[in-house]
Design a protein with these regions (language model features):
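N-terminal helix-turn-helix DNA-binding module of bacterial transcription factors
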Residues: 1-60
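N-terminal helix-turn-helix/winged-helix DNA-binding helices
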Residues: 2-4, 42-80, 89, 99, ...
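Short beta-strand segments enriched in small/hydrophobic residues
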Residues: 17-19, 55-71, 169, 177-184
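Bacterial carbohydrate/catabolite-sensing allosteric modules
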Residues: 43, 84-89, 137-144, 148-230
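Structural motif
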Residues: 93-114, 214-230
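Short beta->alpha connector loops
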Residues: 99-102, 123-128, 148-149
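Active-site-adjacent beta->alpha loops and helix N-cap segments on the catalytic face
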Residues: 127-138
Length: 230
């Protein structure tokens, strides 16, 4: 038997395809109509194509999430709790891994918009002007995590305070030879504000900020820099 379609279900139930679409999208239907469609769906074990449905409906119930990588602790935990929260609100998560490539992140923003997702959650590691122009060019709400975006919604961490307080704690414990290992200022939150928090704490103790070490997000390079400077 060929794969069942919405058209087939509509014919069997004696309703229009719009009514069947409304059933799958959780729209209002008469009780008997809903039960009739459900009986057919259950009988043939029919599962709607979420992405095909998304392209045809106003409400896709899909949220695209663009992460810089899949192997980091932060990305993994962020995805875990985002997916949990979204599923509790009847949304599906579509994950795109940019592998620390800004061009890929920008490409995925446009790709997800073409797929008619209801929203995009973005974890950027750089903040170039290209993000602003790309986000403004699409008609999909975008939320940035971890970076400030004046032109869109953003959820930020206070990297400056976190780094300053941590450094203050280390210095107050009697340690004076402090090194900072961070990324470049292309990542404004982590590369600039976090480093600035460390420097301000060192200044409070009249210490020079000479051990400022810059790396990328890769574990191997970070390991080598630490090994060379111990």
């Amino acid at each position: 038997m060929k794969k069942l379609t919405i058209v087939d279900i509509a014919k069997m139930a004696g309703v229009g395809t719009t009514t069947v679409s409304r059933y799958f999208n959780g729209g209002n239907l008469k009780k008997e109509t809903r039960e009739r469609i459900k009986e057919i769906v259950d009988k043939y074990n029919y599962t709607p194509n979420t992405f095909a449905k998304a392209l045809k409906s106003t409400d896709s119930k899909i949220i695209g999430v663009i992460v810089p990588c899949l192997h980091s602790y932060i990305s993994g935990n962020t995805l875990k709790y985002l997916d949990k929260e979204l599923k509790e609100n009847n949304y599906e998560t579509l994950i795109m891994n940019a592998n620390f490539d800004e061009n890929k992140q920008l490409e995925y923003i446009k790709k997800l918009a073409r797929m008619n997702v209801d929203g995009i959650i973005l974890l950027p590691t750089t903040m170039s002007k290209a993000y602003e122009s790309t986000i403004k060019s699409i008609d999909v709400p975008v939320v940035m995590l971890g970076q400030e975006g004046e032109y869109t919604y953003s959820v930020e961490y206070n990297d400056f305070n976190a780094a300053r307080d941590l450094t203050n704690y280390v210095l107050a414990s009697g340690h004076k030879k402090v090194a900072y290992l961070g990324v470049s200022e292309d990542d404004v939150a982590v590369g600039y504000y976090r480093k600035l928090g460390v420097i301000r704490a060192l200044e409070k103790y009249n210490l020079e900020s000479k051990n400022i070490l810059i790396t990328n997000f890769g574990m191997e390079e970070g390991y080598e820099i630490v090994r060379e400077n111990i």
